[in-house]
Each structure stands twice: as C-alpha cells, then as structure tokens.
Amino acid sequence: MRVGVVCPYSFDTPGGVQNHVLGLAAHLRTQGHDPFILAPGDLDDADPWQAQFRSSFTSAGSAIAVPYNGSVARVNFGPLSAARVRRWLRQGDFDLVHIHEPITPSIAVLALWASEAPVVATFHTATPRSRTMQLAGGTMRASIE
C-alpha cells in the first residue's frame, strides 16, 4: 500500500511525534508498504536514521513557532501550505493517509480536509480542557468522524 504520513511538527526541531512518524514509516517498510512523509522543515541528512527517509520525505515548507499546551509547536498553515498539501496528496495517489494530530491548525488539518483517500488519525495529546480545542471541537467534529 502507498501510505501518506502527515506530521504537523517541523523536522527542524527534534520531537516525539517526529520520531514516532519515522518509526512508523520504518515499520511500514518492513511490512512491504511504501510510506511517504509530509512535514514542515527538513530531515537532517547527517543523521543516518533520518537520512534513510530522504527519498520519501516532502517538506511542507518552513514553520513558525506557536506557543501551545505549555510547549512551542513549530507548524505551518495557510494558502501556500494548503497548495503543497493538495499537490502532495494528488501526486502521491495514496491508498491510505495517516495524519498525526489531525485537528492541530497545521498541515495536518489541511490534509484531513483535502484527502480523498481513507484517513487514519493519531492523537498524541489529550487536552480536554484546552480552550482552543473546545472552540474548535464543534467545527472539527465532522472532519474527524
């Protein structure tokens, strides 16, 4: 299967979700699937773990730092990002799209809205009291169901 994997967080900054995405892509390869990653930032070619994904990685562009949930998320969003997401989805012709943090205002939600392939989503955080999520919850409910 051709699997599109969307990471909302920039690969220019190390993080748990980014590492999870790479681990998932590596596992999918061992199972005979073809994973393709879309994320802001770029891989570190000096890091052999990241460099092995060079041919299947597409950068969604540079990211901006956004304070969120006691941390700083480096994400991108907007018309240029939306065009990159749509192009990646169209060119990828994926059998399945796996979106990490699908309601984060980032390329993740853009991919959720634009994908015509079946979508699997992974939520890495639980923020039931987040005002942002409470406000977005009603708007996003149809997209995540």
Identify the residue ranges that each predicted region occupies.
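Short N-terminal targeting/anchoring amphipathic segment
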Residues: 85-106
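Membrane-proximal helix-turn-helix segments that form the acceptor-binding/catalytic region
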Residues: 127, 133-145
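Extreme N-terminal starter segment of soluble prokaryotic enzymes
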Residues: 1-3
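A short helix->loop->beta-strand "cap" motif at the edges of active sites that frequently abuts
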Residues: 116-118
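Histidine-centered beta-alpha loop that forms part of the nucleotide-sugar donor binding/catalytic region
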Residues: 8, 100-101, 123-127
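N-terminal strand-loop element at the rim of the active site
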Residues: 7-14, 26-79
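Structural alpha-helical scaffold elements that stabilize or flank donor/cofactor-binding regions
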Residues: 88-90, 111, 142-144
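Conserved alpha-helical elements of sugar-nucleotide-dependent glycosyltransferases
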Residues: 16-27, 107
